[in-house]
């Protein structure tokens, strides 16, 4: 059988499922010393350290003078890739921009009867660094990662956006990444990968100016570097392996369910694909489909490892129990393959993104629909959200107190200050009474 079959009807059942999922946690502590050494080297030696790591791990003959991609190389890549592919990238970017434009927040103000004005101002960060993974040595360009990270930053109004991505063995970048950058109007692109690229974005080098915020997925070294830089720069999130949970009733198409589970399982041996259904018949049919469909995949070994180790088909007493389990898992991707998707939606509390109905498989959102595919994983959808325009913004409160407000409330404010042992605070407000 391609993956285990479980049941869920009690807290004890949940403990078993939770233990299975928790086993996927990356042992970040194991690489911390290595990442710390990399970060220290970048901080002290800048471009020289960056070039050294790039020669060692990516391109043996890397020329430091090619660290930043020349503008004409970006334009050339856009001309070289098939025109049809460029049109697809452009349309995907337009869809993503259209969705994220709805997330923009304007400044707002309220005025009290005494004339006091209170409000909130939203401003973008001054600069953002985007990390785009290499994708099998640059052979599988992660175009969607660039689009999903760059577009919300642009909609937010970030003035400077820098992109880093590891070079191929010959020192070049995949032309599809450069073409996507051209479509987006990005021209600050650097040939650098892994933890040394993240450190360069945070600390700066002779060539790369430091940024205020870093976003983008990566391996355990990238993730560890981002986590260790919290407080130095803002980061998008600490993401774990990809995951999908599908709630399906007896009317769901088993072939569709299996295909959607495999769309996540092929990502990574640590990826998780879970079907939750009240239908034993569907559960059995999906098992059969998984075995049939996995055979034809180029990444079949990866998918099989994911299905075997971290995936499951869970049979529940009813749909309510399926929703209950889903809310406990808090999946990155949640598909609702049930007859009344909108009726079930109101019961969903925890999910990174929700895919509704048979025509909304997860890849539709991953690539093209418009919502962001940078989503919370490992149960963090209980308290966090997808990458968005707000991720690249800061909010400042505005307080313009009237004389009447301050003088009327000075004694109360001073009393609160003195209760906290802060005499200077009390005197500050009392000085406005004279």
Curated annotation (Swiss-Prot):
> Which residues constitute the signal peptide according to the record?
none
Single GO molecular function: NAD binding
Residues at the active site = 332-333
Q: Which residues bind Zn(2+)?
A: 264, 267, 366, 425
Entry's Pfam families?
Answer: Histidinol_dh
| Record's cofactor remark | Binds 1 zinc ion per subunit.
Which residues of this UniProt protein bind substrate? 242, 264, 267, 333, 366, 420, 425
Catalytic reactions on record: L-histidinol + 2 NAD(+) + H2O = L-histidine + 2 NADH + 3 H(+)
Which cysteine residues pair off into disulfide bonds?
Answer: none
**Gene Ontology cellular-component annotations:** cytosol
Positions in coiled-coil regions: none
Q: Which InterPro entries match?
A: Ald_DH/histidinol_DH, Histidinol_DH_CS, Histidinol_DH_monofunct, Hstdl_DH
Q: Which SUPFAM superfamilies match?
A: ALDH-like
Q: What is its EC number?
A: 1.1.1.23
Tell me where on the tree of life, at the top rank, the source sits. Answer: Bacteria
GO terms, biological process: L-histidine biosynthetic process
Q: Which pathway does it operate in?
A: Amino-acid biosynthesis; L-histidine biosynthesis; L-histidine from 5-phospho-alpha-D-ribose 1-diphosphate: step 9/9
Record key words, sorted = Amino-acid biosynthesis, Histidine biosynthesis, Metal-binding, NAD, Oxidoreductase, Zinc
Q: Which cofactor does it need?
A: Zn(2+)
Provide the function of this protein.
Answer: Catalyzes the sequential NAD-dependent oxidations of L-histidinol to L-histidinaldehyde and then to L-histidine.
NCBIfam families associated with the record: hisD
Q: Which family does it belong to?
A: Belongs to the histidinol dehydrogenase family.
**What is the protein name given in its UniProt record?**
Histidinol dehydrogenase
The species is: Oleidesulfovibrio alaskensis (strain ATCC BAA-1058 / DSM 17464 / G20)
Taxonomy-wise, where does this protein's organism fall, top ranks first?
A: Bacteria, Pseudomonadati, Thermodesulfobacteriota, Desulfovibrionia, Desulfovibrionales
Gene that this sequence comes from: hisD
């Amino acid at each position: 059988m391609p993956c285990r079959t479980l049941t869920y009807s009690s807290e004890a059942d949940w403990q078993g499922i939770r233990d299975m999922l928790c086993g996927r946690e990356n042992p970040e502590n194991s690489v911390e010393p290595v990442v710390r050494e990399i970060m220290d080297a970048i901080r002290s030696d800048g471009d020289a350290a960056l070039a050294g790591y790039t020669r060692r791990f990516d391109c043996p003959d890397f020329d430091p003078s090619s660290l930043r991609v020349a503008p004409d190389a970006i334009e050339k890549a856009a001309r070289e890739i098939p025109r049809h592919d460029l049109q697809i990238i452009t349309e995907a970017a337009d869809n993503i921009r259209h969705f994220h434009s709805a997330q923009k927040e304007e400044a707002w103000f309220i005025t009290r009867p005494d004339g006091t004005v209170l409000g909130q101002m939203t401003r973008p960060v001054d600069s953002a660094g985007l990390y785009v993974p290499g994708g099998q040595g640059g052979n599988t360009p992660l175009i969607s990662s660039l689009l999903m990270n760059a577009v919300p930053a642009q909609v937010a109004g970030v003035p400077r956006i820098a992109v880093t991505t590891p070079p191929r063995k010959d020192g070049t970048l995949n032309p599809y990444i450069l073409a996507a950058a051209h479509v987006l109007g990005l021209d600050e692109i650097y040939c650098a990968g892994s933890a040394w690229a993240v450190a360069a974005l945070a600390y700066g080098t002779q060539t790369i100016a430091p940024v205020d915020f870093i976003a983008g997925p990566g391996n355990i070294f990238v993730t560890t570097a981002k986590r260790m830089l919290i407080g130095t720069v803002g980061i998008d999130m600490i993401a774990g392996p990809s995951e999908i949970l599908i709630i399906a009733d007896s009317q769901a198409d088993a072939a569709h369910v299996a295909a959607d589970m495999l769309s996540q399982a092929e990502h990574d041996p640590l990826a998780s694909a879970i079907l939750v259904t009240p239908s034993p018949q569907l559960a059995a049919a999906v098992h059969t489909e998984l075995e049939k469909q996995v055979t034809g995949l180029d990444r079949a070994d990866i998918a099989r490892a994911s299905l075997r180790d971290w995936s499951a088909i869970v049979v529940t007493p009813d749909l309510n129990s399926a929703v209950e389990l889903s809310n406990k898992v808090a999946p990155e991707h949640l598909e609702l393959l049930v007859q009344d998707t909108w009726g079930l939606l109101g019961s969903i509390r925890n999910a990174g993104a929700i895919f509704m109905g048979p025509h909304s498989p997860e890849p539709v959102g991953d690539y093209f629909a418009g919502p962001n595919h940078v989503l919370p994983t490992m149960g963090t959808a209980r308290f966090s959200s997808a990458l968005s325009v707000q991720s690249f913004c800061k909010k400042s409160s505005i307080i313009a107190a009237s004389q009447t407000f301050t003088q009327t409330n000075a004694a109360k404010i001073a009393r609160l200050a003195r209760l906290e042992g802060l005499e200077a605070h009390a005197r500050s407000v009392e000085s406005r009474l004279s």
